[in-house]
């Protein structure tokens, strides 16, 4: 049974964010900047973020050459460049918010290996470098044959290596820990192991399950930041995360 203080101080919020990954925590931090006195809570169903925030390999990337080639087949050029720019700005915001040391950011570059004798990507380097020149003010992609052996690959199998000097690596565990620390500094609640089982936008409440107990949180505003899992609450939405 909850106490009066638990009900009044922990269950009623101006903003509730569903999803405790990168998107959810940044949403909460940005809202705090706009509304310094707001009561904000982040609800995460897992002990750790359930999405990709800590499950990727630590890539601080915006797109290899072949990824951009694939994107160009699936969308128009303007859309592709807009998405790429958002990725680049997102990485810049992450670095500005946490600092490189906190998340162990290392600018080692990004590398793509090829096994064909003459992959199509080689012919597209100059094309995409020209497209990205306004954003980076330099060539993004280049061939680096000397690094095939330097990295320990068999050059009889790996025929080409294309380097992206603007990509890097991060420690996603340290990154998430850093963001959690930011939430604490900004007086934002974070509830882990708290799965939202019911969402009622009319009554402005979410029902959660934590340690076998059902709890109702009330909100004035709600942000769904669980990306691919948003269909859990709105089945009719066509959500295709990139």
Placement of each model-derived feature along the sequence:
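Glycine-rich FAD pyrophosphate-binding loop
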Residues: 32-55
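Flavin (FAD/FMN) cofactor-binding and adjacent substrate-gating region
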Residues: 66-72, 96-181
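Central beta-strand plus flanking loop segment that forms part of the substrate or channel wall
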Residues: 57-60, 65, 110-113, 237-242
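Helical element adjacent to the flavin cofactor pocket in flavoenzyme catalytic cores
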Residues: 155-219
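Central helical "cap/lid" subdomain
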Residues: 210-242
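Glycine-rich Rossmann-fold phosphate-binding loop(s) that bind the pyrophosphate
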Residues: 19-25, 45
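Glycine-rich active-site loop/strand segments that organize a redox cofactor
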Residues: 51-85
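Extreme N-terminal leader/targeting segments of oxidoreductases
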Residues: 1-15, 33-34, 38-39
């Amino acid at each position: 049974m909850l106490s009066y203080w638990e009900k009044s101080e922990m269950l009623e919020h101006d903003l509730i964010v569903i999803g405790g990954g990168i998107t959810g925590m940044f949403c909460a931090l940005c809202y705090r900047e706009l509304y310094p006195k707001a009561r904000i809570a982040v609800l995460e169903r897992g002990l750790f973020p359930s999405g990709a925030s800590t499950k990727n390999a630590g890539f601080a990337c915006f797109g290899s050459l072949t990824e951009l080639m694939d994107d160009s087949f699936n969308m128009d050029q303007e859309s592709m460049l807009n998405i790429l720019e958002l990725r680049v700005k997102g990485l810049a915001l992450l670095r500005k918010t946490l600092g490189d040391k906190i998340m162990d950011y290392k600018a080692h570059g990004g590398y793509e290996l090829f096994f064909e004798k003459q992959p199509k990507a080689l012919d597209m380097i100059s094309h995409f470098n020209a497209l990205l020149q306004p954003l980076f003010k330099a060539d993004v992609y280049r061939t680096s044959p000397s690094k095939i052996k330097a990295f320990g690959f068999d050059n009889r199998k790996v025929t080409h290596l294309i380097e992206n000097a603007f990509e890097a690596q991060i420690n996603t565990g340290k990154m998430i820990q850093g963001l959690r620390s930011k939430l604490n500094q900004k007086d934002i609640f974070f509830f882990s192991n708290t799965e939202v089982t019911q969402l009622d936008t009319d009554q402005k409440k979410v029902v959660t399950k934590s340690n076998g107990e059902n709890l109702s949180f009330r909100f004035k505003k709600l942000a769904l930041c669980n990306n691919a899992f948003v269909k859990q609450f709105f089945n009719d939405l066509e959500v295709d995360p990139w």
